[in-house]
UniProtKB/Swiss-Prot annotation:
Species this protein is from: Pirellula staleyi (strain ATCC 27377 / DSM 6068 / ICPB 4128) (Pirella staleyi)
The record's free-text note on cofactor binding: Binds 1 potassium ion per subunit.
Function: Catalyzes the epimerization of the S- and R-forms of NAD(P)HX, a damaged form of NAD(P)H that is a result of enzymatic or heat-dependent hydration. This is a prerequisite for the S-specific NAD(P)H-hydrate dehydratase to allow the repair of both epimers of NAD(P)HX.
Protein name: NAD(P)H-hydrate epimerase
Residues that coordinate or bind K(+): 60, 131, 167
InterPro entries xrefs: YjeF_N_dom, YjeF_N_dom_sf
Length: 227
């Protein structure tokens, strides 16, 4: 776990870009490594019998689909809550959505769920909630079903794990949107982020774990040398 490096939004994006363009890695490989290692982190935190994963449409949601698949393979009862229409998934996230669908993982569309209270009914008997809605690249206010899901998560007593960063937290400033997930554990990828050093942000992050996604050390050293 690398606790020395701190990469902002720009450098975090460069990790993926260089891994693919220069080091010959596939985006699907990076997503698989990220999601699998978060799933292992969850499985190490017992009890982990039932997990509800709330996904967005981007790569953070794609990580959520990988997490769901690995938890399902380990015998965990998994439910995935969609905050976006299935046809909005693109690229690697769409591939992993299709795999989860074929694997018959339980998927529930929240787009017509009218209230946070209605969303919270899906949390019954869960050991963990997983926030896989927005990650380091996100800015601005969460809207629609995503906003309602955040309210439901924060009103719940179920332990919450955020993927990369809690939805609604700005990677660089540590500022919180008017609604932002308050996580018990945050699994951020490759390095810490600037927001991890902001005192006011700590109540949203909870325990921070840095998760390896298998990028070469040479790649990180190359980014370290950049201004």
């Amino acid at each position: 776990m690398d606790l020395q490096r701190i990469y902002d939004r720009r450098k975090s994006r460069l990790v993926d870009e260089l891994a693919i363009a220069k080091y010959g890695m596939l985006g699907l490989m990076l997503m698989e490594n990220a999601g699998r290692n978060v799933a292992y982190e969850l499985l190490a935190r017992t009890p982990c019998r039932r997990v509800v994963i709330v996904v967005g449409k981007g790569n953070n949601g794609g990580d959520g689909w990988v997490i769901a698949r690995h938890l399902d393979a380990a015998g965990v009862d998994v439910i995935v809550l969609l905050t976006t229409a299935p046809n909005e998934f693109r690229g690697d996230a769409a591939v992993n959505y299709a795999i989860a669908n074929l694997a018959k993982i339980k998927i529930i569309d929240l787009s017509r769920t009218p209230t946070a209270e209605a969303i919270a009914t899906h949390f019954a008997e869960a050991d963990w909630l997983v926030d896989a809605m927005l990650g380091t690249g996100a800015t601005g206010e969460p809207r629609g079903a995503m906003r309602l899901a955040i309210e439901a998560i924060n009103q719940s007593s179920v332990r919450t794990l955020a993927v990369d960063l809690p939805t609604g937290i700005d990677c660089d400033s540590g500022g919180a949107a008017t609604v932002a997930v308050r996580a018990d554990v945050t699994c951020t990828f490759v390095t810490l982020k600037p927001c991890c050093q902001v005192a006011a942000c700590r109540s949203y992050l909870g325990e921070v774990r840095v998760i390896d996604i298998g990028v070469p050390r040479a790649l990180l050293e190359e980014i370290d040398a950049m201004p």
